Amino acid sequence: MISLPLTTPILPSRCLLHKTRRQNSTRRRLLIRSSSSLQDQFTVETTKRVVLVRHGQSTWNEEGRIQGSSDFSVLTKKGESQAEISRQMLIDDSFDVCFTSPLKRSKKTAEIIWGSRESEMIFDYDLREIDLYSFQGLLKKEGKEKFGEAFKQWQEDPANFIIDGHYPVRELWSRARSCWPGILAHESKSVLVVAHNAVNQALLATAIGLGTEYFRSLLQSNCGVSVLDFIPRADGGSPHVCLNRLNQTPNSPLAGGSSGGRKASKQIILVCHGQGNNEDSAVINQAANNDQAMNMLGVIHSQKTAELLLDLRVSSIVCSPKTASIESSGVISRVQEAAGCLGVDNVPHYVKTKQMNELDVESVLRKSNKDNDVIASQLDEEAFSALWNRSEKAWESLLDELSDEKSNPGEIMVVVGPAMTHISLIAQCLNLTKEALGLFHLDAGSISVIDFPDGPSSKGVIRCTNYTAHLGRWSIPITKPA
């Protein structure tokens, strides 16, 4: 597991967005000047964990109708089943309070998940879904036919989308930002928030300082669970905010579906290698000095991950040149190839595998290690920059391979490496700066999924991060023990 210390937290001062096309394998970064960050707006006295859940499938979800903040749709039977699965997933978790949107589809989901808990439920109208004005109630094809260019802008440039004199996404970001003081001021350590797709995106983005340009970059599926940690600083300033996990769904995150209404043409699956010998759960203990093999728990992690990936036909595996990553990738490739021979058609499935030196962060840590107990933010500036530059090269190389003309539509690439490497790749995907590495947390054996609905030359969509449900009894609980 990788997390950053509280003494010198790394926070995003500015967020960046890249052009949709890479030129000469070098992305141009455009500065987003956004006031969406909460960093200067509040403090917390104790650590707070906020768990966000999107409502289950609604009747209008099923029909493909634009809901917005209307309150006509209700949960389908599938939606109620999804909410029940989420209830079971969260049944042993400790919550002090539940905030929810009062719209029927969200309210019903919250009631199912909350179950027999005696703690209070707070209905907050500001947690309603995005206001879409004249779009609301239309089938998506009707919106395209009736509104033409406006509907195209909603699909392609939602941050600047305007309808009926309103900018819905900008209004949503402002409303989400205004929700946080009330949520965090509540005397509770663990908060459940049940709301909607777009408003949950806005809550996540405003918490970690991302602007409206990131709308549809952090996927929120029906009954998907996301977790934010707000950790007080010793100096009493604004808290360190960390996205512990994103979009943990009732079913497998590899089960398909769309990203923001679009089918992913290609995917990158980030697999944190199985736990190695001497690895501590909170720090990289001795990893800088030892090329560790996996311990028995790490072997179990890898086997569980390989089983999960049987839902997909993996095209290629790229891994760090370190032993634990090589071992994990070997387990995945062997299971993939064996499954091909055991299939109905009995067709051998060859998985292309390779090692990539740029995925090796241990060598960077080793150069900076002085006491065999290295945490990322304790790196000196030179080593920190070297780690970031290496991850940028790795990300560009991965995109180049995925963009290869010889690659097939729907290609799935699995990338195996340590948690810090994958945190860096997620930040690269979102085109953030190196100061944003403290925004994310990954555990050993977890997977994170990046979709490319418009191809790898365009913006990636984070489908989920730090998914561990496939690890069974070794999975990481949603909330911390009471």
Swiss-Prot record:
Family indicated by similarity = Belongs to the phosphoglycerate mutase family.
Its biological function?
A: Phosphoglycerate mutase-like protein lacking PGM activity, but having 2-carboxy-D-arabinitol 1-phosphate (CA1P) phosphatase activity. Prevents the accumulation of D-glycero-2,3-pentodiulose-1,5-bisphosphate (PDBP) a potent inhibitor of ribulose-1,5-bisphosphate carboxylase (RuBisCO). PDBP is produced during the oxidation of ribulose-1,5-bisphosphate, the substrate of RuBisCO.
EC numbers listed for it are 3.1.3.63
Q: What class of enzyme is it?
A: hydrolase
Provide the protein name. Answer: Probable 2-carboxy-D-arabinitol-1-phosphatase
Question: Domain of life, per the record?
Answer: Eukaryota
- Xref: Gene3D superfamilies: Phosphoglycerate mutase-like
In which compartments does the protein localize? Answer: Plastid, Chloroplast stroma
Q: Which GO terms describe its cellular component?
A: chloroplast; chloroplast stroma
Record InterPro entries: His_Pase_superF_clade-1, His_PPase_superfam, PG/BPGM_mutase_AS, PGM_Phosphatase
Q: Does the keyword Plastid apply?
A: yes
Where mainly located? plastid
Q: Specify the species.
A: Arabidopsis thaliana
Q: Could you point out where the transit peptide sits in the sequence? A: 1-34
The yes or no answer to whether the keyword Chaperone is present is no
Q: Where is the active site?
A: H55, E129
Q: What SMART domains is this protein classified in?
A: PGAM
Q: Which GO terms describe its molecular function?
A: 2-carboxy-D-arabinitol-1-phosphatase activity
Keyword annotations: Chloroplast, Hydrolase, Plastid, Transit peptide
Which reaction equations make up its catalytic activity?
Answer: 2-carboxy-D-arabinitol 1-phosphate + H2O = 2-carboxy-D-arabinitol + phosphate
